[in-house]
Amino acid sequence: MSKLSDIRREYTLGGLHKEDLPGDPIELFSKWMEQARDSEVLSDPTAMSVATVDADGQPFQRIVLLKRFDKGGFVFFTNLESRKSQQIAINSKVSLLFPWHSLERQVAITGEAEPLSTAEVMKYFITRPKESQIAAWVSKQSSKISARQALESKFAEMKAKFSQGEVPLPKFWGGYIVKPTSIEFWQGGEHRLHDRFLYSKENSGWDISRLAP
């Protein structure tokens, strides 16, 4: 068995310099996201880790797809009865991480998650493929199930039920916007001298600090 301690590589794709940074982190995130989408080395550039904590302070993470972002925040959709939603109801402070390994980059975001309005959720829900809309009705996310067959049987049942017409929006399905309080950009550097810049939200705008790697 190979030793994990022997696995290493150099980071050589480029650096990040403070004089090149925009005053608004969303501008830099938009640029990096566009580059991630245009690259041919990332299959899921919008995939992000969403970290929440439960009532006991136990953290949990899961991969969720980013569906929209702007100066107001970062949007994702989910089952409102899921573990993540239950934890957000207890503590709305969350963390997001975009691990763009192939580009030697990552973006870490902290902020508060706020529920989206039903109108905002519906606007997105109707754009989903019909099978995905049906799947939203099928899965009681994070609950225990006896076997995959139970899930597939329920899907077949709901597919028949909604075979004619539009699939209605489940009351237990919605979304959140994470309003950022900090955004950190990490760019890999040679000899582990990585570039890290932290944008911290202030009343007058954003403070930018370089962090030691």
Curated annotation (Swiss-Prot):
FMN binds at residues 62-67, 77-78, 83-84, 106, 141-142, 186, 196. One of its GO terms (biological process) is pyridoxine biosynthetic process. It catalyses: pyridoxamine 5'-phosphate + O2 + H2O = pyridoxal 5'-phosphate + H2O2 + NH4(+); pyridoxine 5'-phosphate + O2 = pyridoxal 5'-phosphate + H2O2. Binds 1 FMN per subunit. NCBIfam families: pdxH, PRK05679.1. Catalyzes the oxidation of either pyridoxine 5'-phosphate (PNP) or pyridoxamine 5'-phosphate (PMP) into pyridoxal 5'-phosphate (PLP). This is Pyridoxine/pyridoxamine 5'-phosphate oxidase. It comes from Shewanella sediminis (strain HAW-EB3). The gene is pdxH.
